[in-house]
Amino acid sequence: MRADCFPSSDSPGPTVLAGEVLRRLRRPPIAGGPQALTDFFDRLLQARRRVLMLDYDGTLAPFEHDRMRAQPYQGTRELLLRIHTQPGTRLVVVSGRPAREAADLLALAPRPETWGVHGWERLTPSGQLVRAILPQQAKVAMTRVLALKPQLEGAGARVEQKYASIAIHTRGLSAQQAAQVRALIAEFDPPADGPPRPEGIYLQSFDGGFELRALGPNKGSVVRGVLREEPRETLIAYLGDDVTDEDAFAALGGRGLAVRVLPPAGAETPPRRSIAHVALRAPEELLQFLQRWADLPFGAVPPP
């Protein structure tokens, strides 16, 4: 694979992108709701190139205490396969998991393009895995995090080492246990008047824990890379549930629809602000969206 297929060197770092997201949050809310979906699907039917990008955990599959049991919602695979095989449509999965792990859990054949570790890994449909180069500073910082593994696991957390990050899972822990875990990794997110943060890595919360991530690619840089590879008129939708997906929403610009996927009724998470155009409740509204896309007669679009 060509080096320029990997959006790493020219992608803004998380500090810059976070500022971009905050600026967008201060603007008037983006018009959304049912009409936004209607307008999008009207445009989608006329588009000659389409890209559907989706997160995995919390979007295509519910969260599970045992992460390897997180299977897609019933009916999701069949709809994604129909979309994946549509003419002029590109299906892309973007996950915080390792790319092969996400692809294996989704278990689509033929396999779609899959990005893992928030954009550090790219798994092509042919099975080729490409990774961005991990800076030495990040490697050193991750070693410091791994030195805390016995204490973190002693507090009840589950520590997962990935290529460019270390996830610390706290799902199912009490508030006291979660606070103890957070205190153990406080040095990686010091206050403004505290000691300097270790170079090459930063701390980000997610739904179910914390992640120490190397500075570099993120889901927003994946979107920008896909946009560069596609014709200008390509229409894109990105579906995601977590704060890490806000980077992707921001990167869409005016080229597509940002969809926040909400958890099933009864599995609510703390409210937070989002720059998504619309929100869909999993699994019912998610499946309706995929069904609507899968049912469009793209083969009927006349040639220019």
Enumerate the language-model features and the residues they cover:
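Short amphipathic alpha-helices and their capping/turn segments at secondary-structure boundaries
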Residues: 31-48, 101-108
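Asp-based phosphoryl-transfer active-site loop
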Residues: 45-66, 93, 223
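The start of beta-strands in P-loop NTPase/AAA+ ATPase cores
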Residues: 50-52, 112, 236
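Short acidic, glycine/proline-rich loop/turn micro-motifs
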Residues: 63-66, 125-129, 271-273
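Active-site phosphate-binding/coordination module
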Residues: 71-161
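Conserved acidic, metal-coordinating active-site core of Asp-based
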Residues: 160-239, 243-252, 256
